[in-house]
Structure formats: C-alpha cells, structure tokens
Amino acid sequence: MANEKTQSDLNEKLIAVNRVSKTVKGGRIFSFTALTVVGDGNGRIGFGYGKAREVPAAIQKSMEKARRNMVTVALNEGTLHHAVKGRHTGSKVYMQPASEGTGIIAGGAMRAVLEVAGIRNVLAKAYGSTNPINVVRATIAGLSGMNSPEMIAAKRGLSVKEILG
C-alpha cells in the first residue's frame, strides 16, 4: 500500500506519441507508441516506452514502465553539481549548472526530463540525433553519471573542503 501512495505524487509527462504500422498479408496493422517520463521533483526520474493498438493504452503502458524504471540523481538546490555529458547511440547531450532565476534552457524531450527531475536552473544542449527516445536516454545517462562533492570526497577518502579547493 505504501508503494501506491509514493507513486501518486509523481509528475508525469508525455513526450511523444507515434503511429507505427506492421505490414501483413492483408494490409497494414496500425498501433501507437508513447514515450513518457515520470519524476518526484526531487531527483528521482524514470522513462517508459509503451506500445498498443490504442493511444490511451500505449500511454498507460509507458507510464507503468517509467514508474518501474526509476533512477535517483543527486541535485544541488535545483540545479546540477557540475557540467555533465551524456550520450546514447547518435544523441549527445551537454548540461551545465545555472544560477538561480535562469530557468530550464533546454529543448524538447530533454526539457521534460529535467522538469520532472526537479531541476529548475540548467543550461542544456542536444547534439547529433534529436530522436526523443535517444535524447531521453542520453539525458538520464548524463544525470546518472553526476556525482555530488560529498560522494567524490567519500570515494577518495578526503574532506569536501579538499575536493572543492
């Protein structure tokens, strides 16, 4: 029961709905795909990709997959700890922290991921392929690779002061 409660306060965003077809002997069979992201606004994000014969069913499937596929990202007061790069297949993304009041300067699929993650100030750019699925995967990969100064200090056996200089 506790699991149901935590899932109800997640932000959900639909990124893309696409009609796809399968060609069979009798003609084409159309179905729909949906790409969604979910997040708690506090560093937990997940994405899902669902496919069904009807749009609502595809969206529902992708939301369920997104809730099952969540990762935690270390945030620094609504922005990133440091500049990060992420890549997935042909998509490359670059994200850097921004000062308070900057907002989310990012395009398309990347903006949705950053919004549901709870990042409020960031400068971001997508290079190469802008296929939404690949951009979402690259963004999540980049955010997952980000470490807080505390995490780096613990790994190196140093104090946070020594890490930050």
Curated annotation (Swiss-Prot):
InterPro entries assigned to the protein according to its UniProt record, in alphabetical order: Ribosomal_Su5_D2-typ_SF (IPR020568), Ribosomal_uS5 (IPR000851), Ribosomal_uS5_bac-type (IPR005712), Ribosomal_uS5_C (IPR005324), Ribosomal_uS5_N (IPR013810), Ribosomal_uS5_N_CS (IPR018192), Ribsml_uS5_D2-typ_fold_subgr (IPR014721)
A GO biological-process term: translation
Pfam families per record: Ribosomal_S5, Ribosomal_S5_C
Domain S5 DRBM, residue spans: 10-73
Cellular component, GO, one term: small ribosomal subunit
UniProt GO molecular function: rRNA binding; structural constituent of ribosome
Keyword Membrane attached: no
Gene3D superfamilies, sorted: 3.30.160.20, 3.30.230.10
Alphabetically ordered keywords of this record: Ribonucleoprotein, Ribosomal protein, RNA-binding, rRNA-binding
SUPFAM superfamilies, per database record: dsRNA-binding domain-like (SSF54768), Ribosomal protein S5 domain 2-like (SSF54211)
Signal sequence extent: none
Swiss-Prot/TrEMBL domain comment: The N-terminal domain interacts with the head of the 30S subunit; the C-terminal domain interacts with the body and contacts protein S4. The interaction surface between S4 and S5 is involved in control of translational fidelity.
Family named by the database record: Belongs to the universal ribosomal protein uS5 family.
Function according to Swiss-Prot or TrEMBL: With S4 and S12 plays an important role in translational accuracy. Located at the back of the 30S subunit body where it stabilizes the conformation of the head with respect to the body.
Oligomeric and partner information: Part of the 30S ribosomal subunit. Contacts proteins S4 and S8.
Annotated protein name in UniProt: Small ribosomal subunit protein uS5
Lineage of the species this protein comes from: Bacteria, Pseudomonadati, Pseudomonadota, Gammaproteobacteria, Vibrionales
Gene that encodes it: rpsE
